[in-house]
Curated annotation (Swiss-Prot):
Gene Ontology CC terms: plasma membrane
This enzyme's EC code(s): 2.3.1.269
Active site (record annotation): E289 (proton acceptor), K353, C406 (nucleophile)
Protein name stated in the entry: Apolipoprotein N-acyltransferase
Family listed: Belongs to the CN hydrolase family. Apolipoprotein N-acyltransferase subfamily.
PROSITE patterns the record matches: CN_HYDROLASE
Residues annotated as transmembrane: 37-57, 75-95, 106-126, 128-148, 179-199, 207-227, 505-525
SUPFAM superfamilies: Carbon-nitrogen hydrolase (SSF56317)
Sequence ranges assigned to domain CN hydrolase in this UniProt record: 245-494
Length: 532
């Protein structure tokens, strides 16, 4: 039956092949949050393999014409994957629909069409290494691993919903990322998901199926072994008690000047709320991204009010817009920042967002695009300015946190920082732009994996959720649901040493890619000697 199905898929051509690739990519989205149906990958990727088999059937064409059919299949697969996985981005444009609704097709269709080029590239690279049986599965894993790595930095990068996350729906399956990194997880996921295509036979088919089963069992086994050695999920003797404030301010209200005092009072009220029975008195309180509705440098009364709300020894970490006056009366600069404020209402330290969202927080090619009448989605004169360096944020008792503002948490290779060693990751964000869509769940999963990957606990304060404290094994020690109003009180989990120490992320990536490339090329050469 599988051979018959594969044969029918291989024989598809024209729009039928494109539609099958699109639907296969869309089905693969079910492997990502909030669905986490990872078995969908065992359908989508074998179909992709068979579609590429059909696309490369001709061998009499020139080099480019041999590559293009596979690239087209990859593009349609990617287009389906990204349209169905990122459609919710368009909801941000409907917050101010009168001004931004015109851009909805660009967000819902244009961005997926661009991102699909990476999967077209993946299929094209795989085609170069394609060989019968196991060789094509290795080639596809290499192509996707390379493409997903490029997605982390090309054109400022947008590594959202990397295939590797499909293999990490629960903490048990997150532990391998500490060893092989996110690119390695993407390669593992593609190889294992695509392996059922070998059930139709081919060179080394049994070897490939056996290897996929072994890798899947090793992935699960390593997770079980790691978690069996993990400490208690909640450390009730932790050195630092943390409170996360989740106000769930509607996005339409957030930038309304008439609502500023009400928003501020709500944040202060949640900060002053007594801990529930059995919960610790917080040492550190965290507010979400741009939570403070004032420019603190020019609003001393807001700082005084914060100081009054904090108990002795408490520290507030809060997201706010930071203003830097222009030289000689020039235009001021604005930064998306995190402030540390002590119990006397003094600013102790600040950290600015380094990796801004294109078109959301700043305009690429600003002079040209402003000339066309375009502007950022965030209503900030001139947009935000990027911070120059990422540094550890001084907090309390000699401890410091690694600040990641909003979508900075999705970049696995951007966690280098200056200053003393951080004892936690602090991620402040505002996902209210996206409402009750898959977006906030996908964003949270990526931040959750950073804790495992880096060996640092995660403190995540999101305006409308998902707010949580996550230990270094990916386990949640306290959380609030989407759109809930309240606080999370919990002790800060301890950090742990990463599996490989802290080498630059690119070293791990290059080793994975070279291993896959060597295996693919070696299998091609061996097959030619043995079967021809």
């Amino acid at each position: 039956m599988i051979a018959r199905l594969a044969g029918r898929i291989i024989l598809l051509s024209g729009w039928r092949r494109a539609l099958a690739a699109f639907l296969s990519g869309a089905f693969a989205t079910l492997t990502q949050p909030p669905f986490d149906i990872f078995v969908a990958g065992f359908v989508s990727f074998p179909v992709l393999v068979w579609l590429i088999d059909g696309a490369i059937a001709r061998t009499d064409a020139g080099p480019l014409r041999r590559l293009l059919p596979a690239a087209k299949v990859g593009w349609w697969f990617g287009f389906g994957y990204f349209v169905s996985g990122l459609w919710w981005i368009g909801t941000a444009l409907l917050v101010d629909a009168d001004q931004f609704a015109w851009a909805l097709p660009l967000a819902v269709l244009g961005l997926p069409a661009f991102l699909a080029l990476f999967y077209a590239f993946a299929a094209m690279i795989a085609r170069l290494l394609w060989s019968d049986g196991l060789g094509r599965i290795l080639a596809l894993a290499f192509g996707f691993a390379l493409a997903e790595w490029l997605r982390t930095f090309i054109f400022t990068g947008f590594p959202w919903n990397l295939i590797g996350y499909a293999a990490m729906p629960v903490p048990l399956l997150m532990q391998s990322v500490a060893v092989i990194g996110l690119v390695g997880m993407s390669a593992l996921a593609v190889f294992v998901f695509a392996a059922p295509a070998l059930l139709t036979g081919g060179h080394f088919a049994r070897t490939g199926i056996g290897l996929a089963i072994f890798l899947a069992l090793a992935h699960v086994g390593f997770g079980a072994w790691t978690l069996s050695r993990a400490p208690a999920i909640v450390d009730e003797n932790g050195p630092l008690a943390v409170r996360i404030v989740q106000p769930s301010i509607a996005q339409a209200m957030k930038w309304d000047n008439a609502e500023r005092r009400a928003i501020f009072d709500k944040l202060v009220g949640l900060t002053e709320e007594a801990p529930a029975e059995g919960k610790p008195r917080p040492d550190v309180i965290v507010w979400p991204e741009t939570a403070i509705p004032y420019i603190l440098e020019s609003t001393p009364q807001a700082l005084a009010h914060i100081g009054d709300a904090l108990q002795e020894g408490q520290v507030l970490l809060a997201g706010a817009v930071r203003e830097e006056k222009g030289a000689d009366g020039g235009e001021p600069r604005y930064y998306n920042s995190i402030y540390t404020i002590d119990d006397r209402g003094r600013i102790v330290s600040t950290a600015d967002k380094v990796h801004l969202v294109p078109f959301g927080e700043y305009l690429p090619f600003e002079s040209f695009l402003r000339g066309l009448g375009l502007q950022e989605v965030v209503e900030m004169p001139g947009g935000f300015t990027a911070g120059t360096t990422r540094h550890a944020l001084a907090v309390k008792d000699g401890r410091s946190f690694l600040p990641l503002i909003c979508y900075e948490a999705i970049f696995p290779d951007e966690l280098g920082y200056e200053g003393a060693g951080a004892s936690a990751i602090i991620n402040v964000t505002n996902d209210a732009w996206y409402g009750d869509t898959p977006g906030p769940y996908q964003h949270f999963r990526q931040a959750q994996v950073r804790a495992v990957e880096q060996g640092l606990p995660l403190i995540r304060a999101a305006n409308n959720g998902l707010s949580a404290i996550v230990n270094t094994y990916g386990r949640i020690t306290g959380s609030l649901a989407l759109d809930a109003v309240g606080v999370v009180d919990s002790y800060l989990p301890s950090p742990r040493d990463p599996f490989w120490g802290r080498p630059p992320g690119w070293i791990q990536t290059v080793l994975i890619l070279l291993t896959l490339l060597a295996a693919s090329v070696g299998l091609i050469l061996y097959s030619r000697r043995r079967f021809h």
